[in-house]
């Protein structure tokens, strides 16, 4: 698969691009499926009510929802964590999120960018992540990189063997490649710029 930057993903990592209408705008987001020795790990799950698009993306990769064993949520926003409740109901996946993100996912805190009267359905976080946690995958190690700024407890995922980065919203991307964080959508811009510098120190290809 390919992400919006045109970056080629290593074998075992698949782009699950999801397109939704947001009023007048058409928005495309990029959950990913990562194959591991014990099943598929989803990195983010997309909008509420759009799990069928995740299923379709998995099918395009020769995978199925029944292959999914875990979901790693990069941060609390509804376009990344919104479909979690439906996913857990249907598959019983293990949910991972950073320790500072977990309260927003599980309902102890209200998602910081959601209106007070609405949020996606809360879901228990089974395992709370910290910086440096490593997953074994078909594409080699997948390392959790703590990248706060855009949202509390934001993480990115780095594959050192291929130099691949799933930045989530720590960076922005367009046709010309990766760029720094978007000030418009970032809670703590100084933290976000520090996070971008940390990512820049990694081997990215």
What is each residue range found by the language model?
Residues 34, 44, 54, 75, ...:
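Divalent metal-coordination and catalytic microenvironments
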Residues 48-49, 141-148, 152-205:
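Metallo-beta-lactamase
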Residues 126-139, 144-148:
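Internal catalytic-core helix/loop-beta-alpha segment
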Residues 49-53, 57-134:
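Active-site HxH/HxHxD metal-binding segment of metal-dependent hydrolases
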Residues 9-20, 112-117, 138-140:
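Short Pro/Gly-enriched beta-strand edge/turn motifs at strand-loop
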Residues 39, 100, 133, 140-142, ...:
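Well-ordered beta-strand scaffold positions
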Residues 4-61, 156-168, 172-173:
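Conserved beta-strand hairpin/beta-sheet module of binuclear metal-dependent hydrolase folds
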């Amino acid at each position: 698969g390919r992400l919006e930057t045109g970056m080629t993903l290593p074998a075992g990592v698949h782009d699950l691009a999801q397109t939704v209408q947001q009023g007048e705008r058409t928005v495309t987001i990029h959950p990913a499926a990562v194959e591991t020795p014990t099943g598929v790990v989803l990195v983010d799950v997309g909008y509420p009510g759009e799990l069928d698009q995740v299923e379709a993306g998995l099918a395009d990769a020769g995978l199925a929802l029944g292959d999914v064993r875990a979901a790693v949520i990069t941060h609390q926003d509804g376009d990344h964590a919104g479909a979690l409740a439906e996913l857990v109901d249907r598959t019983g996946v293990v949910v991972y999120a950073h320790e500072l993100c977990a309260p927003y996912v599980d309902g102890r805190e209200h998602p910081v960018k959601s209106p007070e009267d609405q949020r996606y359905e809360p879901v228990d976080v089974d395992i709370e992540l910290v910086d440096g946690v490593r997953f074994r995958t078909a594409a080699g190690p997948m390392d959790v990189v703590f990248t706060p700024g855009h949202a509390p407890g934001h993480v990115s995922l780095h594959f050192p063997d291929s130099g691949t980065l799933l930045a989530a919203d720590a960076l922005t991307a367009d046709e010309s490649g990766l760029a720094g964080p978007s000030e418009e959508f970032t809670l703590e811009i100084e933290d976000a710029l520090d996070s971008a510098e940390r990512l820049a120190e990694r081997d990215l290809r």
